[in-house]
């Protein structure tokens, strides 16, 4: 009996590999766990060709997402500063703070671009002034924006 068998993963498995990856596992693990649950299949030539096609489609999808992110970056870099007006109390302190959602709403109002608030890195904004925000549009594409907070 073979010591190890090669399988193609149909799903990502912790501590084993990502979907589409060819890995070597014990024959019993493959036969009793991976194959019955549909997590993996034997590394046959047809399975390897199918995985290669899927990986090519994924590469194309990621390239398209990156080009969209580059276009968004160009649009956002045209904005010198985003101005957000907030109600102010004593000593130029804001009532509350400026949140990533406030910045995303301001960007959408100005440019029409939808930005995910979870992809923003903002300092704590509790006073009037100018701050710098970093927005991660794609793992390889980030943009820095100036945010000016003014009184209502």
Curated annotation (Swiss-Prot):
Gene Ontology CC terms, in alphabetical order: ribonucleoprotein complex; ribosome
InterPro entries in the record: Ribosomal_bL9, Ribosomal_bL9/RNase_H1_N, Ribosomal_bL9_bac/chp, Ribosomal_bL9_C, Ribosomal_bL9_C_sf, Ribosomal_bL9_N, Ribosomal_bL9_N_sf
Matches recorded under Gene3D superfamilies: Ribosomal protein L9, C-terminal domain (3.10.430.100), Ribosomal protein L9, N-terminal domain (3.40.5.10)
Superkingdom field: Bacteria
Family indicated by similarity: Belongs to the bacterial ribosomal protein bL9 family.
GO MF term set: rRNA binding; structural constituent of ribosome
Presence of the UniProt keyword rRNA-binding in the record: yes
Protein name: Large ribosomal subunit protein bL9
UniProt-listed NCBIfam families: L9 (TIGR00158)
Keywords: Ribonucleoprotein, Ribosomal protein, RNA-binding, rRNA-binding
Pfam families referenced in this protein's UniProt entry, alphabetically: Ribosomal_L9_C, Ribosomal_L9_N
Gene Ontology BP term (one): translation
Entry-linked SUPFAM superfamilies: L9 N-domain-like, Ribosomal protein L9 C-domain
């Amino acid at each position: 009996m073979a010591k190890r068998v090669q399988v193609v993963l149909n799903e990502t498995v912790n501590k084993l590999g990502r979907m589409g990856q060819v890995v070597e596992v014990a024959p019993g693990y493959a036969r009793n766990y991976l194959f019955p649950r549909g997590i993996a299949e034997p590394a046959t030539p047809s399975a390897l060709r199918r995985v290669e096609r899927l990986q090519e489609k994924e590469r194309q999808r990621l390239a398209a997402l990156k080009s969209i992110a580059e276009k968004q970056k160009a649009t956002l870099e045209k904005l010198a500063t985003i101005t957000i007006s907030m109600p102010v109390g004593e000593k130029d302190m804001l009532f509350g703070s400026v949140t990533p959602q406030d910045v995303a709403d301001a960007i959408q109002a100005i440019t029409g671009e939808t930005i995910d608030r979870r992809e923003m890195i903002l300092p704590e904004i509790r006073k009037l002034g100018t701050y710098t925000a970093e927005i991660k549009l794609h793992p390889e594409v980030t943009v820095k924006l100036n945010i000016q907070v003014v009184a209502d």
